Amino acid sequence: MTNIRKTHPLLKIINSSFVDLPAPSSLSSWWNFGSLLGVCLGVQILTGLFLAMHYTSDTATAFNSVTHICRDVNYGWLLRYMHANGASMFFICLYLHVGRGLYYGSYTYSETWNIGILLLFAVMATAFMGYVLPWGQMSFWGATVITNLLSAIPYIGTELVQWIWGGFSVDKATLTRFFAFHFLLPFIVAALVMVHLLFLHETGSNNPTGIPSDPDMIPFHPYYTIKDILGFLIMLTVLSVLVLFSPDLLGDPDNYIPANPLNTPPHIKPEWYFLFAYAILRSIPNKLGGVLALVMSILILAIVPILHMSKQRSMMFRPLSQCLFWLLVAILFTLTWIGGQPVEHPYIIIGQTASVLYFLIILIFMPATSLMENYLLKW
């Protein structure tokens, strides 16, 4: 008799995705981040659901409701810090996942890659709106500064900002709609994840060599299920240590001050995972130019497949491209550091230099190096 997992209409979908899925035999730990992101999303939706049961999206009570969650709700502090630090883990896994895709040439699966970029934007939007909800100083001023960027859009900018605010400033209407969207978006992200996996399973996984692995495939279960479970345990251990020992390590102390429209914090900055983009935004003196650079810093990923000039898919056997890739990583770390610094000398010029190099490496140096490597290999 055929196994029920291969015949049942629902179980056979799960079976073909997670049990009998043919997977390359050479996948390294860099391929763990997809499943880790799935766990992060699950943790965020669960903790977020329980937080939403106690949170009130009203300017008068939002800050106090978060305090109430931490002090009076059973394990409310754990839920709150798991959710806040879970977002950091989410972005660490996201950036490593994208970095893996860039290094090993996974972007040549264009549908999977483009859905991934959509997912990145959706998760960033969700995280931004979530940061506004505790209604602390950085929540309020972060929301004001970032939404105000839309006023740089010619002709419709001002009206657009007021439409998003629901008034003439960030206020009760803004907080309520941000809560509604923050609740809704993770489920849209979950749906996009399904589409992401659907397109991935059409082509099959890439592997570290970048060479087609059709002759050498192994079943996903038990080999990669056990490997993924090890990844889950490591990530959840790191998250637990962060939550239980230093829950405020990655947060901003200003967010423990209730939002006050009459008092601007000395340094307005977003959460650490947006600092690289914030540094690129600030490095351009013109408002519209800054906004365009900000959007392009992420959207540039969409043209990476077009800029792929190498005859090889992966960077595994391309030492010159590897050097450029790690230089790009160093530049992203530099931009993250600069984003958290005040706008003064020497930080301004460092940020501008790093921003220019970021775009130059992706748009010019990487394709040029690929062509040179082709020439050196007489291809």
Curated annotation (Swiss-Prot):
Keywords: Electron transport, Heme, Iron, Membrane, Metal-binding, Mitochondrion, Mitochondrion inner membrane, Respiratory chain, Transmembrane, Transmembrane helix, Transport, Ubiquinone. The cytochrome bc1 complex contains 11 subunits: 3 respiratory subunits (MT-CYB, CYC1 and UQCRFS1), 2 core proteins (UQCRC1 and UQCRC2) and 6 low-molecular weight proteins (UQCRH/QCR6, UQCRB/QCR7, UQCRQ/QCR8, UQCR10/QCR9, UQCR11/QCR10 and a cleavage product of UQCRFS1). This cytochrome bc1 complex then forms a dimer. This is Cytochrome b. Heme 1 (or BL or b562) is low-potential and absorbs at about 562 nm, and heme 2 (or BH or b566) is high-potential and absorbs at about 566 nm. GO terms for biological process: mitochondrial electron transport, ubiquinol to cytochrome c. One of its GO terms (cellular component) is mitochondrial inner membrane. It holds the Pfam family Cytochrom_B_C. It comes from Centurio senex. It is found in: Mitochondrion inner membrane. Its cofactor is heme b. The chain crosses the membrane at residues 33-53, 77-98, 113-133, 178-198, 226-246, 288-308, 320-340, 347-367. The keyword Protein biosynthesis does not apply. Heme b b566 binds at residues 97, 196.
